[in-house]
């Protein structure tokens, strides 16, 4: 009976002791992140660094509308194809939209020299001033300026480019011409012209009254002399002749001089360019909408302040960096492992080793206490706030460093530059791969550091409590301490805020420890006596059983016993 009372006393003492546990917050979040060592770690809080959505529309860029070329190409627009007449009045834009394979380009067949370079130049232009460089009515009094072609028809009538003049002979003559323009616009001026290549000598004589024509174009940075190539060619757009198109950029203060005795397609309008580094040319079939955005891709607009996107590598405006990643999520909270709460008489709760606490909602780290006055959770606001500040600063720093928003337009190559285009693609792919690797590695490393940081903070909080309590309490696992003395709410609060008075409770704790140690010793002595008696009794039972079996076997002759003296 005495043994039973001692065991019950020991159990009662352990069950009803005051306790305090250190743990961390948990919630119902299903966010997962990757670290250097683990994949799909469930965490309480995280931030997404990768934008993967767009609106599927073409939008204004910071309130400025794009220039939609419609069914016209850049060549058709800048030369003044009659079918692109509606674009003539457009002089400013946020970016240029060209459809894939537009119908209206160069209406009169021929080669457009350095066309891809011209597109590249225009991709950085946000506005221009279209002005008459050589007025039609006064610049060419000795030449006919009404040359048209059925291949450039408009509304069923033969026409020609709005920005060029096809000069032909007048009154049976084509006098030598010399015309110059001095750039006084204080901007670069884009000048375009052409050279006509007739299909036969008869056509050459009829138009220009000479067989040995030339065209010369000279400026400080450009000098070239063209000779018409008279030859029969396959018909294109019902034309056997060709017009080759040329352009140059005239610096402020520079002069361009045109000399010719035939075959000149003269400039009528030129363009004073204003550069805008946020502009660009994109190929897209996306519809225009009444929306405003900071970033435009061929697939649609992106409205995001995130540092990375995987929507499209070609972007216009202030855009996140393109990476090939499918997921870039940075942890800001803790590992989310809600504990399985085992409830005894006083609802004992597992601590931070086995899992977090969903009941603690006002902080990341904190305490759960239990005494005669009840139980409850309390966050450690100081350590939580320090952690929040540190992680917030880190996330902001990462986003700020990686969030270099910019325009990334595609490079232009002609059909004869396939090797260069392929090399450029390989280089671009290499850069994208490097950016993707750097972004993913950065997130993996920072996630690992953040989770280790949280683990360290919980451990530091545990050590803080342990150093205060010393031998006034014992560690019982799961981040918990069991007091050797009564600890009311005021006492619990002193442990949490670091003002626990160790000497005040040391005597009570000492007596409690001695009492518990005495109970353990007496209980151990009783158990030893019981063990001895149990061993002796079992041995006697075994001997009696063996004797009875031997006697029975001897009596029925199964066992013979001989005693020799």
From Swiss-Prot:
Record keywords, A-Z: Clathrin- and caveolin-independent endocytosis of virus by host, Clathrin-mediated endocytosis of virus by host, Disulfide bond, Fusion of virus membrane with host endosomal membrane, Fusion of virus membrane with host membrane, Glycoprotein, Hemagglutinin, Host cell membrane, Host membrane, Host-virus interaction, Lipoprotein, Membrane, Palmitate, Signal, Transmembrane, Transmembrane helix, Viral attachment to host cell, Viral envelope protein, Viral penetration into host cytoplasm, Virion, Virus endocytosis by host, Virus entry into host cell
Stretches of the chain found on the membrane's Extracellular side: 18-528
Cytoplasmic compartment spans: 550-565
GO cellular component: host cell plasma membrane; membrane; viral envelope; virion membrane
Glycosylation sites (chain numbering): 27-28, 40, 71, 104, 142, 176, 303, 497
Annotated signal peptide: 1-17
Disulfide bonds: 21-480, 59-291, 72-84, 107-152, 295-319, 487-491
GO BP: any one term: viral budding from plasma membrane
Membrane spanning stretches: 529-549
Subcellular location, record wording: Virion membrane; Host apical cell membrane
Membrane topology according to the record: Single-pass type I membrane protein
PTM info: Palmitoylated. In natural infection, inactive HA is matured into HA1 and HA2 outside the cell by one or more trypsin-like, arginine-specific endoprotease secreted by the bronchial epithelial cells. One identified protease that may be involved in this process is secreted in lungs by club cells.
Lipid attachment residues per UniProt (S-palmitoyl cysteine): 554, 561, 564
Keyword presence, Glycoprotein: yes
Sites marked Cleavage: 343-344
GO molecular function terms noted in the UniProt entry: host cell surface receptor binding
Family membership noted in the UniProt record: Belongs to the influenza viruses hemagglutinin family.
Known function: Binds to sialic acid-containing receptors on the cell surface, bringing about the attachment of the virus particle to the cell. This attachment induces virion internalization either through clathrin-dependent endocytosis or through clathrin- and caveolin-independent pathway. Plays a major role in the determination of host range restriction and virulence. Class I viral fusion protein. Responsible for penetration of the virus into the cell cytoplasm by mediating the fusion of the membrane of the endocytosed virus particle with the endosomal membrane.
Quaternary data: Homotrimer of disulfide-linked HA1-HA2. Interacts with human CACNA1C.
Further facts: Major glycoprotein, comprises over 80% of the envelope proteins present in virus particle. The extent of infection into host organism is determined by HA. Influenza viruses bud from the apical surface of polarized epithelial cells (e.g. bronchial epithelial cells) into lumen of lungs and are therefore usually pneumotropic. The reason is that HA is cleaved by tryptase clara which is restricted to lungs. However, HAs of H5 and H7 pantropic avian viruses subtypes can be cleaved by furin and subtilisin-type enzymes, allowing the virus to grow in other organs than lungs.
Name of the protein this chain belongs to: Hemagglutinin
